[in-house]
């Protein structure tokens, strides 16, 4: 990653060091300004007062990470709040105040906004500070990939705390006063070990850790401890009171930084997330960290039985300073390949309508709407080339080059300007707060990078650093800089590596934390990096884009679309959200309550980087069913976007809608009939994207129609190459071309159907399979926390099989035998629920909940079977066609974790089908 920054610097792509430099800074054939255009603004408060980063002397001059989960510490959006707005680290929430750091652990969702938003809003359980501390402000003192250290000082006392994503601990260093904890209500003490105190506040369990030899003193809602000449103390939120000993082990291993490292090879994206620590007492350097759902779904590292509640679903705890994930990479193509389903004459007509338009840029002036227009035109270049329309192709390329070059040259009506205080590059005319709030740079500039990547595919000289590529890379450094040592731009400005997605607000100045609406415009930038890196031979940027896209793809599936139905609260009556907030999610957009746009804003722009959405076909079907229900019928305004979305799951149905309605609709502003026609008809011919198979280069994809797979890849190289797919098939791709085919070699049935039958084994990772010969293992069933969850799944283990076909055996019923073990824990009871979705449409037609099984406190497997009896059942069974069967298992009673055996014929589900 550092090689990239060095290369950019060597090419002269370095912003001016100070305002004393030349007004226009040359970068290859282009330039940017070091001064904003007259009459424009940079970052301000909400009342328009200019602001500079609110950081300590130690941090001055360093690029500040705007667009982060904690950015309100450094970007003072409100003149009367020099501290911060609520910050959502998960599982903890925080807010800086004059006396220190408020800490909360929201565990109960509220449904607000007429049922359109769920939130786990920050609510103070306690405030960590020093006796007498009364600071006039809070500043950012240091930061790393997902941690930050706020700083308070009142002249006599100073306090620093280190907080972060996934961190159950808050680490504090203070001087000038005793450690002081004030609770929101009188605490209950459940453990008093001198310098270690266990308290319960508002039903949440915390441990307070002072230096050895100190003693915590409780007086009402105030708890203090002298530091005995030391300067450190910490606290942790506990998953249960019996976790105190484990958390005490790591209480003095203070986190000092966080780093993610990523790599791409052979169709797999790997990432390692590491915390650096220092031992304040003893020698322990390990720690505990809570993984989000999108992380623990893709790690093979051992996890503890400890869990936390969060707006992103259950977080699972890892006892280590690092963990790693591995995912199949998300497919990207510069355009869908050629197919027999596209009529050349018809496509030519549609292409000419755009290319010969009197205003192909739709009068766009600002960075966002110019970007949308660039995106529309760039999608058509490969299509024109595909059908031999070189004149149209070259005309479109000329339009793209001309408009990009206008923006990439300072001094005209449109330009980019560098702000040396905020270390950012802003395009003027700006829009949607991209200037005053530093919002949405990744949304806007992603279109520019994508368009430049399409140009580079056909004109490598244009893309050279010495020509226009230098300015493209400067936009990349502003939005997705892979370097942590670049003094001109922050590391990955918009992308939160731990949260797994980007944030849109530059200042994060909301009670609900930061937010992102259009996740698809975020992945548009990631796909653009894949294409630009591939086209220019920059494998570092290509691999960065692949990591960003693959990571955010899973986060979108889980947190925007609730693909596994394990994230949104059961009381939230929606299947998708238009916006994700730090505190939760909202069925809304910033500008409209129209359901079409709420559902479509996380789809557009539809490009060869959108194929990842096809990995969750049931979620797409649920999404569109809800859209029509909320809309009172089929889409009217954003028909094309939603037809294209449907084609990723059900191409034939999407084509039927296109055929019936293509003559009477107006394309969405970033779309064209040429692209929509080609997209829908190509997928109808080749089939929907198949995310189960990956190629060994990022620019490859697989489509499946019925039992037929079509392999596609684009080769940017100057000689032919063979692309190998994960199922063993290979495809020879000529130089600088896209190729498709049925593949050669490999297993003719690389993913064979498992043996037919109605008996399913459980597999760790959440699968049900009729295949035998699995590896024996076990999964941990989360503790019920001492509450009664009889009849209601609570942090359940979920096992599922999709695409099931079968005939219901009349009179037969579900059967199961599950091997469970509570170890030596007393009073646990495991409960099972079996659900049947007969058609795979995302709605369960039959749900059966069984009486729980009370395990004994003796280590060893016990068998839980359906003979315990049904507790409740809804719906009815019938013929299953492409259906889904789901098994959920949870602890209905008790306060402790238990285990469920997997990978054997002793833990099975038998369905009443043949």
PLM region spans:
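Ser/Thr/Gly/Pro-rich low-complexity, disordered linker/stalk segments of secreted
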Residues: 744-756
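Proprotein-processing/basic-patch segments
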Residues: 754-813, 817-828, 879-914
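Acidic, glycine-anchored loop motifs typical of Ca2+
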Residues: 779-780, 840-842
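Secretory targeting and sorting signals
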Residues: 1-22
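Short, surface-exposed tryptophan/glycine-enriched loops
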Residues: 512-515, 853-894
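Conserved aromatic beta-strand anchor motif in extracellular beta-sandwich/beta-rich domains
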Residues: 832-838
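Aromatic-rich carbohydrate-recognition surfaces in CAZymes
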Residues: 364-384, 435-473, 518-526
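Ser/Thr/Asn(+Pro)-rich, low-complexity disordered segments
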Residues: 23-442, 482, 486-495, 533-536, ...
């Amino acid at each position: 990653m550092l090689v990239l920054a060095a290369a950019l610097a060597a090419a002269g792509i370095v912003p001016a060091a100070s305002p004393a430099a030349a007004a226009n800074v040359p970068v290859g054939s282009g330039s940017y300004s070091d001064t904003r255009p007259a009459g424009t603004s940079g970052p301000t408060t909400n009342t328009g007062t200019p602001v500079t980063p609110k950081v300590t002397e130690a941090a001055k001059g360093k690029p500040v990470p705007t667009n982060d989960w904690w950015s309100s510490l450094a970007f003072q959006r409100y003149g009367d709040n020099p501290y911060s707005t609520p910050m959502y680290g998960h599982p903890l929430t925080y807010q800086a105040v004059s006396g220190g750091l408020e800490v909360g652990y929201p565990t109960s969702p509220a449904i607000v906004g007429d049922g359109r938003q769920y939130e786990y809003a920050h609510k103070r359980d306690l405030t960590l500070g020093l006796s007498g501390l009364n600071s006039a402000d809070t500043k950012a003192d240091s930061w790393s990939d997902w941690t930050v250290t706020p700083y308070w000082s009142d002249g006599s006392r100073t306090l620093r705390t280190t907080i972060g994503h996934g961190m159950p601990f808050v680490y504090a260093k203070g001087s000038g006063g005793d450690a002081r904890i004030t609770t929101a209500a009188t605490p209950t003490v459940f453990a008093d070990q001198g310098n270690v105190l266990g308290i319960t506040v508002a039903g949440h369990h915390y441990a307070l850790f002072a230096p050895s030899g100190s003693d915590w003193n409780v007086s009402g809602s105030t708890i203090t401890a002298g530091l005995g000449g030391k300067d450190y103390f910490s606290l942790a939120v506990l998953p249960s009171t019996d976790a105190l000993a484990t958390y005490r082990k790591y209480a003095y291993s203070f986190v000092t930084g966080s780093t993610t490292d990523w790599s791409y090879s052979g169709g797999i994206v790997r990432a390692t997330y590491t915390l650096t620590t220092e031992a304040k007492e003893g020698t322990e350097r390990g720690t505990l960290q809570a993984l989000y759902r999108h992380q623990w779904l893709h790690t093979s590292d051992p996890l503890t039985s400890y869990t936390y509640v969060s707006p992103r679903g259950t977080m699972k705890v890892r006892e280590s300073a690092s963990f790693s994930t591995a995912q199949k990479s998300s497919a990207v193509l510069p355009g869908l390949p050629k197919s027999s389903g596209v009529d050349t004459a018809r496509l030519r007509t549609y292409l000419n309508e755009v290319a010969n338009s009197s205003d192909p840029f739709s009068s766009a002036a600002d960075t966002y709407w110019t970007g949308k227009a660039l995106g529309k035109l760039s999608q058509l270049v490969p299509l024109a080339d595909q059908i031999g329309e070189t004149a149209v192709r070259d005309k479109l390329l000329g339009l793209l080059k001309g408009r990009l070059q206008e923006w990439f040259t300072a001094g005209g009506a449109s330009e980019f300007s560098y702000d040396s205080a905020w270390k950012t590059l802003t395009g003027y005319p700006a829009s949607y707060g991209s200037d005053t709030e530093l919002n949405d740079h990744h949304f806007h500039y992603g279109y520019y990078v994508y368009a430049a990547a399409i140009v580079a595919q056909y004109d490598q000289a244009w893309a050279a650093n010495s020509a226009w590529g230098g300015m493209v890379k400067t936009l990349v450094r502003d939005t997705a800089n892979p370097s942590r040592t670049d003094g001109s731009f922050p590391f990955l400005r918009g992308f939160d590596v731990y949260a797994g997605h980007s944030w849109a607000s530059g200042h994060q100045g909301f009670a609900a934390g930061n937010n992102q609406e259009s996740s698809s415009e975020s992945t548009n930038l990631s796909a653009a990096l894949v294409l630009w890196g591939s086209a220019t031979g920059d494998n570092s940027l290509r691999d960065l884009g692949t990591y960003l896209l693959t990571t955010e793809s899973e986060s979108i599936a889980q947190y925007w679309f609730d693909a596994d139905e394990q994230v949104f609260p059961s009381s939230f009556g929606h299947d998708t959200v238009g916006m994700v907030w730090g505190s939760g999610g909202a069925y809304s957009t910033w500008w409209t309550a129209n359901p079409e746009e709420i559902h479509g804003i996380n789809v557009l722009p539809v490009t060869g980087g959108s194929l990842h959405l096809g990995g969750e076909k049931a979620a797409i079907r649920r999404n569109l069913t809800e859209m029509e229900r909320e809309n009172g019928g089929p889409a009217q305004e954003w028909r094309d976007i939603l037809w294209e979305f449907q084609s990723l799951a059900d191409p034939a149905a999407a084509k039927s809608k296109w055929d019936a309605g293509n003559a009477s609709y107006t394309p969405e502003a970033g779309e064209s009939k040429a692209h929509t026609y080609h997209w829908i008809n190509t997928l109808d011919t080749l089939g929907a994207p198949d995310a189960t198979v990956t190629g060994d280069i990022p620019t490859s994809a697989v489509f499946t129609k019925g039992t037929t797979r079509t392999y596609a890849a684009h080769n940017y190289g100057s000689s032919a190459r063979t692309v190998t797919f994960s199922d063993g098939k290979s495809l020879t791709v000529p130089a600088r071309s896209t190729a498709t085919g049925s593949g050669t070699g490999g297993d003719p049935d690389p993913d064979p159907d498992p043996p037919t039958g109605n008996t399913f084994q459980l597999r760790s990772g959440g699968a049900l399979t009729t295949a035998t010969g699995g590896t024996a293992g076990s999964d941990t069933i989360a503790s019920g926390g001492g509450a009664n969850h009889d009849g209601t799944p609570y942090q359940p283990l979920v096992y599922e099989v999709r695409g099931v076909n079968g005939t219901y055996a009349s009179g037969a019923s579900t059967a199961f035998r599950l091997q469970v073990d509570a170890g030596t824990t007393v009073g646990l009871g495991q409960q099972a629920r079996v659900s049947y979705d007969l058609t795979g449409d995302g709605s369960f037609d039959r749900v059966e909940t069984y009486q729980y099984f009370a395990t004994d406190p003796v280590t060893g497997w016990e068998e839980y079977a359906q003979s315990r009896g049904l507790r409740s059942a809804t719906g009815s069974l019938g013929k299953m066609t492409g259906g889904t069967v789901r098994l959920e298992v949870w602890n209905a009673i008790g306060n402790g974790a238990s285990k469920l055996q997997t990978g054997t014929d002793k833990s099975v589900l038998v369905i009443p089908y043949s």
